[in-house]
């Protein structure tokens, strides 16, 4: 039987919900076989982040040049910064049979849905908006005005969770990690995915 094409896993949610923390927890697990697609951004690097590991950090001018060259699956401007997903790595890795894991903003996920309708979309939600605000304040990296801007944006994003296949509440990082891994495992066992492989196999037998 031919190698199964990889699954595109899209994790997104409001800023401050813990997407990066959950993603790191998933990739610390030695059983994880997903390939992480590193996003590109123009925002400033935070303490502890590494260029080329957490994000590819670019200037606004560099990012806009890549937009003109159509080098992104998706890109979005969020609170004054660009975020985007380089296209070629994702396509090549899926064709090799690997699952590709994207951690992106909600606006970006909407664009991916149009280009990759068969992708798996998971919305990471906070236990409450008050909890989200506390996390943003706890970062200590942004002004009160910017924090309020992110909370207001989060309200709109939570209303868009109906665009996703699954919602995982990040009340505890380890639990959120386990839920996401279980969702991916179940997705690979869906009848539609298994049936397509067997239909192809049966056609080859008839030749």
Curated annotation (Swiss-Prot):
Keywords, comma-separated and alphabetical: ATP-binding, Cytoplasm, Kinase, Nucleotide-binding, Transferase
Binding site for ATP: 13-20
Role summary: Essential for recycling GMP and indirectly, cGMP.
GO cellular component, one term: cytosol
Reaction(s) the record says it catalyses: GMP + ATP = GDP + ADP
UniProt key word Kinase: yes
SMART domains, per the entry: GuKc
Domain of life per record: Bacteria
Source organism (scientific name): Staphylococcus epidermidis (strain ATCC 12228 / FDA PCI 1200)
NCBIfam families noted in UniProt: guanyl_kin (TIGR03263)
Listed GO MF terms: ATP binding; guanylate kinase activity
Family per similarity comment: Belongs to the guanylate kinase family.
Protein's UniProt name: Guanylate kinase
Family annotation (PANTHER family): GUANYLATE KINASE, GUANYLATE KINASE-RELATED
